[in-house]
C-alpha cells in the first residue's frame, strides 16, 4: 500500500465512528415513528446504544491486537460493524435496532484503537506525525458533512438507506483491508494476554492523580458533547422551529471544532498543553455560564444558541486532545492499556451523561445549557484535583511542552 493510499485508508478508519453517529441525526424522528417509539426523546437511544458499545469494546481491542495481530482483529471488528448494519436495515422493533446499534459500536471501536497502532507499526517520528496529521485533516471533514449525507438520503430514500450506506462503508473497508493491508505487527512483537499484567496496568492508571483527574475532566466535557449530539435535532425542530437549518448550522458548529483542532496542532508545541487546555477550559466554562444566563433571561434564539455553541465547541477542540495527552503522560510505559481504559471511561461516562441531558429535553434549550454549565464546573474541579489546585503549571517539563 503506497503512502497516499495508506493515509486515505487510515482517515477512513478514523471516520467510521463519526459517520455512524452524525449521519443518524436527521433521521431520528423518522426512525422513532417507524419503530413506534412513544416518546420522542427515546429516539436518542439510537445514538447512546452505539456509544455504549463503542466505549465498552475499547477495553479489549488493544490487548487482542497485541496478541493476534492488527489485520485479523481489524477484520473481525469491520465484520461486526457490517453485519450489525445489516441487522439495523432489517430491524422491525426498537429493541432489535438498539442491539444492532450497540454491535455497530463494538465493531467500530476496532477502527478507533487500531488506526493509531497500525500507523505506529509502519512509521515513526516525523513520518508518523505526517501520516496522522494528513489523516486527521480528512477525518475533521466528516462531522461537517455527515449530517448532510444523512439528510440527502432521507430526502430521496427511506431512513434505512442510511444503514445501507454504513453497511457499504464497512464492507468496502473490510475488502480494502483484506486486499491491501498486510499484517503490520511482527510476530516477535506479539505479546500474550496477561490478566495480571492488565490488572497491574489498570492499577497504575487509577493510582495516578493526573491521569484520573484528566480522565474524569474529559468525561465531563464529552458528556456535554454527547448531550448536544443527542438533542440537537430536536432543538432545531422543536425549540426553534427550524429543522431545515439543522444540517447547515450543525456543519458550521463542527467547522469551529475542526478549526480549533488545527489551531491546537500549530500552537501546542510552542505554548504548551496545560496553557492551551486550561485557557480553553476557562473559556468553555465562561461561555456555558453566559449561555445559561441567556436562556434563563428568556432571550435565547437560534442565533444566540448557534454562536455560543460554536464558541463552546471551539474550546472543546482545544481541550480534549490535550486532556487525553496529559492523562497519558504518567502512564506512558503502559500506553496501550491506559489508552483503552481512558477511552472506555470517557466514552461510557460521557455517553451516560449525554443521555441524561438528552432525556431531559423539554422543548427548550434550558436542560442542555444548564447541563453544559454543570459539566464545565465539574471538569474544572477535576482539573484542579489533577493539578493540586494550580492551573497553567508545567510540572517541570521543558518550556512550551506542557
Language model region names:
Residues 80-87, 95-103, 303-311:
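Paired small-residue
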